[in-house]
Curated annotation (Swiss-Prot):
Keywords: Disulfide bond, Glycoprotein, Secreted, Signal. It comes from the Eukaryota. Belongs to the calycin superfamily. Lipocalin family. This is Japanin-like-RA2. GO terms for cellular component: extracellular region. It comes from Rhipicephalus appendiculatus (Brown ear tick). Disulfide bonds join 52-172, 136-160. Homodimer; non-disulfide-linked. Each monomer accommodates one molecule of cholesterol in a pocket. The lineage of its organism: Eukaryota, Metazoa, Ecdysozoa, Arthropoda, Chelicerata. It is found in: Secreted.
């Protein structure tokens, strides 16, 4: 009987160690080295004449991550692009994502200084306005532009009123 119990215990320990190796804590995309693409938002957040919004990792220092925010104005051909630096900070498991932006980014993209993290995994992120829960944005890595993770997609669709998905435009990747 002791041999059977010790065999079961050994099997449990082995299974637990394998599970813990494969199901760790997800990486927060906003502070990772991945490029993030805005693929959805609440319809009331639509910004006329701004498309192709993405954010690339630049560096980190003192708990803040520097990212470039890139976006296009599709008014004339060729499209005019703009790039600015923002800083983001997120404490592990925290509800809030903090952001420092330039005046231009704040004006062009109507950014806030804090966002509520509604859902995230290694490749996707749903944020909402701290004061206006109905204002949400959905960000994914390039690998997930065509296949948004189900839990993230469900969170975006159910928590964000009148969700809008941004259409893929090849002009975003010409430059």
């Amino acid at each position: 009987m002791k041999l059977l119990l010790s065999g079961m215990l050994a099997g449990y320990i082995l299974a637990s160690s394998i599970l813990s190796m494969t199901t760790g804590t997800p990486r927060m995309p906003a502070i990772s080295r991945e490029t993030l693409h805005l693929v959805g938002y609440s319809s009331k957040m639509k910004i006329p004449n701004v498309v192709c919004i993405n954010s690339r990792y630049l560096s980190s220092e003192g708990g803040w991550v520097k990212r470039s925010v890139n976006y296009m104005f599709p008014i004339d051909k060729p499209w005019r692009g703009k790039s600015s630096t923002v800083e983001v900070k997120w404490e592990p498991y925290a509800v809030l994502l903090h952001m420092k932006t330039s005046y231009d980014v704040s004006r062009d993209l109507q950014t806030k200084s804090q966002y509520v993290v509604r859902n995230y995994d290694d490749n996707s992120l749903v944020l909402s306005d701290l004061n206006e829960v109905s204002s949400c944005s959905l960000w994914v890595t390039k690998e997930y532009l065509d296949k948004i993770p189900e839990t993230t997609n469900r969170t975006f669709y159910h928590l964000c009123p009148d969700p809008v998905y941004t259409p893929f435009d090849e002009n975003c990747y010409v430059n």
